[in-house]
């Protein structure tokens, strides 16, 4: 599978390569099969950095520690309602509040869709998801961020992640 894909820009109709190797992801789903499937798709797109969490609590800890560029989450989790989880991620005081979120759910009512939109979700996908649909939704997020913020949230997150990695490397050197 090719590591670089192209997508269409809605602005000018031009194609541009989407470099998945520079985008990190956090997949949040209590179903191991779903996490493996999404991870496989992301690796197929060329992504190298994919984290997984089986619960909201684990995801919050991972998000704070790794600063992923995009979070892909289910709504139905054993430890916390998905909407509450999203609101915790998007709390204005949280450093992770600017991370784009894709909801990937097998059960999405109109009420739930309205709720997640109001909570600040960037994209909604219904399970089962195809690689094409996942790719298109990720591309839309990247395109929006690139158009909206010249130093994008992606760049800011990359800087934070580099600082975290540097700190971890320093901590390991002390051992």
Task: Please tell me what each predicted stretch does.
Residues 55, 81-87:
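Acidic catalytic/metal-coordinating carboxylates
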Residues 127:
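A Lys-centered signature of the CheY-like receiver
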Residues 52-70:
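Acidic, metal-coordinating helix/loop segments flanking the phosphotransfer/catalytic sites
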Residues 3, 9-18, 140-175:
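CheY-like receiver
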Residues 32-51:
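Two-component/phosphorelay signaling modules centered on CheY-like receiver
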Residues 39, 84, 97, 108-123, ...:
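Alpha4 helix (beta4-alpha4-beta5 surface) of REC/receiver domains from two-component response regulators
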Residues 77:
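Receiver (REC) domain active-site loop signature in two-component systems and cognate sites
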């Amino acid at each position: 599978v090719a590591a670089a894909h192209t997508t269409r820009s809605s602005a000018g109709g031009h194609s541009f390569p989407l470099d998945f190797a520079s985008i990190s992801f956090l997949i949040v789903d209590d179903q191991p099969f779903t996490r493996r499937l999404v991870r496989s798709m992301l690796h197929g797109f060329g992504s190298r950095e994919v984290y997984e969490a089986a619960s909201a609590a684990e995801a919050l800890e991972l998000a704070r520690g790794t600063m992923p560029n995009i979070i892909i989450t289910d709504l139905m989790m054993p430890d916390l309602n998905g909407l509450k989880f999203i609101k915790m991620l998007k709390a204005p005081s949280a450093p992770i509040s600017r991370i784009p979120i894709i909801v990937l759910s097998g059960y999405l009512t109109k009420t739930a869709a309205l709720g997640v939109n109001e909570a600040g979700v960037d994209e909604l996908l219904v399970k089962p998801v195809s690689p094409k649909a996942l790719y298109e939704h990720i591309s839309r997020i990247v395109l929006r961020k690139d158009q909206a913020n010249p130093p994008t949230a992606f760049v800011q997150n990359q800087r934070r992640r580099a600082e975290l990695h540097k700190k971890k490397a320093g901590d390991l050197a002390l051992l």
